[in-house]
C-alpha cells in the first residue's frame, strides 16, 4: 500500500529544527480558532488574552497565538486563504496536539432567507469543487461535528446573531462562481459557498479530530451580486460570530 513520503509531524519537526526549536517549544492548544482575516485573528487573540507562540510554517506571514487553560489551551491561528494552505496549517496543528477546530470566516449566501450578516454553519458539503479533499480517503460527504454545530448555533443566537445550518458548496474558483451553477445549487437547497470547508471537514474525519466552521455572509449571490462587508448587518454578524467562538473556546 502506498503512503505519504513524509508526515506533517516530520515537516513541522524539520522546520522547527531549522530555527533551533523543538516540539517542546510549541504552544498549540487543544482548541483552535482558525481564521483567514488577520484583523479578526488579532481581535480574537485580544479577547482571549492569547500571546505569540512559535509558528509551524516556514514563513512568518501566518502566525499563532495561544492562551494556556486548565483544559489544554486555546490557539488562535491566522491561516492562508484557500484549501491547500489551510489544510497544511491544520495538519501541522493536529501534529502538535490540536483536537478541535472552529473556522471563523466569511461566506457567499445562496439562500434569500439568510442575507448579509447572518452566520451560516456548513453541515454536509454536497458540492466539492476543490482539489485538496480528494487527496484524503473518501468517507462520504465531508460533514461538521454535530455537537459543535448545535452548540455554536445556540451561542451565535445568544450573542444576537442570526444563524442557519445546512448543505454546502466549496470551490477553488473564487472568481468562477457561475450563474448557472448558483441557480442549480439553489434549487437543490445549498445554503452557501466558501473555499475551505470541504477540505477541513474531510481532514477532520480522517485525522479523528472535530471541526465546525461558522461563516458570516459577506455577499449575496442569488440575484445580482451584493457585496456587504461595509453593511452594519455584516459588522453585527461578525461580532456575534466572534463572541460565540470565544465562548465555545473557553467552555
Model-assigned labels for residue ranges:
Residues 37, 108, 169-174, 199, ...:
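Glycine-rich beta-alpha junction loops
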Residues 139-188:
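Active-site rim beta-loop-alpha module in soluble metabolic enzymes
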Residues 99-100, 191, 210:
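Short acidic/polar active-site loop segments enriched in Thr and Asp
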Residues 198-233:
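Zn-dependent metallopeptidase/amidohydrolase metal-coordination segment
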Residues 221-251:
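His/Asp/Glu-rich mid-to-C-terminal helical/loop segments that flank catalytic regions of hydrolases
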Residues 151-159, 203, 244-251:
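Generic non-transmembrane alpha-helical segments
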Residues 1-151:
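Metabolite-binding pocket within alpha/beta catalytic cores that recognizes anionic/polar moieties
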